């Protein structure tokens, strides 16, 4: 590759891959070339736009949907912070379409922990839309909505290393959600990932990387953060300690397997105190700011805490788990 690919060229290459017309060797070579050169906003936007052409859309979704996610790859093996934050945000009235998969770089991905919590993860498009209508939150399992990505599975497995493909998942929410919180594994990715989200039609977003390496807003360290709001981008140094949150220590936010992480989420949603609660409230506050529900970080933290302490978040998780197993043609979730 003598020069960086343009957005159109990256999109064309991705279409060849998604159609199953590229060999495993070609897919691996392409992924490595883009990754080694450094995935640019042009590369990522082109690849994500092309991948979305092959996705199964979510009916009746609407553009006011929120997704909360991290790209993974920070190597810290924390519990599922963005998943917990999504539940709290939904309990505050934000419509959430959580796009995710099983674990790629830790012991437990969003799909794994939700499955452990009783949520059915493999809903089809109509079922996912019905669940969203009933509860205000739904899960979009990447293999169901992006079947064409199966062509990349073999080469990615053989490479055994993170590549540009690992950055695409958070960019390719099949609901068209225009509200995003997105954590990335390096500071250098914050600006390009924000630019890509804007090119893909996202109207409001917070994209961040914490100084301790976390692809979430961490309570252990400040974060480099870019806010996208209706076409304007502003850069901040965000320190949670300035908003009254205690500094967490290494290990305070550690996760484990799906059973361990599910227990952490249930404990937080039940009102348990400590570092896990603080980091969930922080990331939920970010989601509430993006959604326009909270005008300030303090408001976001207060609303998130109220949803947890008043039982709304735990109650929503129970309703979500129940609704996810109902037929799409049922008008209401049976009592």
Swiss-Prot record:
Mg(2+) 1 binds at residues 82, 216. Anthranilate 1 binds at residues 70, 101. InterPro entries: Anthranilate_Pribosyl_Tfrase, Glycosyl_Trfase_fam3, Glycosyl_Trfase_fam3_N_dom, Glycosyl_Trfase_fam3_N_dom_sf, Nuc_phospho_transferase. Its EC number is 2.4.2.18. Keywords: Amino-acid biosynthesis, Aromatic amino acid biosynthesis, Glycosyltransferase, Magnesium, Metal-binding, Transferase, Tryptophan biosynthesis. GO terms for biological process: L-tryptophan biosynthetic process. Binds 2 magnesium ions per monomer. PANTHER family: ANTHRANILATE PHOSPHORIBOSYLTRANSFERASE. Belongs to the anthranilate phosphoribosyltransferase family. This is Anthranilate phosphoribosyltransferase 2. It comes from Streptomyces coelicolor (strain ATCC BAA-471 / A3(2) / M145).
């Amino acid at each position: 590759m003598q020069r960086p690919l343009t957005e159109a060229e990256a999109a064309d290459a991705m279409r060849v891959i998604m159609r199953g017309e590229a060999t495993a060797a070609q897919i691996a070579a392409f992924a490595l070339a883009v990754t080694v050169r450094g995935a640019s906003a042009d590369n990522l936007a082109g690849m994500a736009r092309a991948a979305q052409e092959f996705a199964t859309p979510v009916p009746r979704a609407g553009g006011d949907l929120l997704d909360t996610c991290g790209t993974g790859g920070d190597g810290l093996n924390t519990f599922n912070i963005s998943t917990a934050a999504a539940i709290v945000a939904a309990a505050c009235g934000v419509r959430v379409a959580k796009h995710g998969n099983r674990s790629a770089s830790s012991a437990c991905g969003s799909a794994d922990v939700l499955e452990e919590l009783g949520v059915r993860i493999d809903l089809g498009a109509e079922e996912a839309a019905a669940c969203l209508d009933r509860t205000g939150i739904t899960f979009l399992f990447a293999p169901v909505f992006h079947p064409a990505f199966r062509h990349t599975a073999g080469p990615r497995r053989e490479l055994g290393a993170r590549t540009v493909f690992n950055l695409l998942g958070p960019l390719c929410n099949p609901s068209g959600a225009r509200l995003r919180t997105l954590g990335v594994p390096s500071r250098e990715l914050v600006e390009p990932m924000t630019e890509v989200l804007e090119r893909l039609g996202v109207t409001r977003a917070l994209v961040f990387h914490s100084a301790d390496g976390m692809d979430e807003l961490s309570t252990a360290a400040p974060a480099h953060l870019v806010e996208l709001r209706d076409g304007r981008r502003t850069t901040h140094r965000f320190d949670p300690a300035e908003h009254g949150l205690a500094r967490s220590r290494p290990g305070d936010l550690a996760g484990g397997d799906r059973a361990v992480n599910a227990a952490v989420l249930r404990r937080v949603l039940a009102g348990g105190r400590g570092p896990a609660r603080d980091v969930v409230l922080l990331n939920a506050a970010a989601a509430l700011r993006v959604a326009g529900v909270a005008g300030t970080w303090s408001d976001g933290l207060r609303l998130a805490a109220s949803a947890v302490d008043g039982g709304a978040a735990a109650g929503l998780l129970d309703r979500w788990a129940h609704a996810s197993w109902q037929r799409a043609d049922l008008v209401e979730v049976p009592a």
